Amino acid sequence: MYLNSNKKKLIIKNYGLSEYDTGNCIVQIALLTFKIKNITNHLKYNKKDFNTERSLQILVSKRKKLLKYIEKKNNTQL
């Protein structure tokens, strides 16, 4: 269950303001979450795949930074 163009368009349509809204933080977080779930599932069966484990750490870090940005942005708007 990998991220192909149809699934990517569906995620963007569900979380974005329009179907072309790929830069929105919420859309980026949703796409990263989908990738993280797939990689986590892959690592359950391939425990010694250390390169994929490292890429998972990078994706989790990116998502964490985006979540922190959204939290900071929402607090300043209030």
From Swiss-Prot:
PANTHER family (alphabetical): RIBOSOMAL PROTEIN S15, BACTERIAL AND ORGANELLAR, SMALL RIBOSOMAL SUBUNIT PROTEIN US15M
Pfam families from the UniProt entry: Ribosomal_S15
Gene name of this polypeptide: rpsO
Keywords from the named record: Ribonucleoprotein, Ribosomal protein, RNA-binding, rRNA-binding
Keyword Glycosyltransferase: no
Family from the record: Belongs to the universal ribosomal protein uS15 family.
Gene Ontology CC: cytosolic small ribosomal subunit
Protein's name according to its UniProt entry: Small ribosomal subunit protein uS15
Listed GO biological process terms: translation
Chain's role: One of the primary rRNA binding proteins, it binds directly to 16S rRNA where it helps nucleate assembly of the platform of the 30S subunit by binding and bridging several RNA helices of the 16S rRNA.
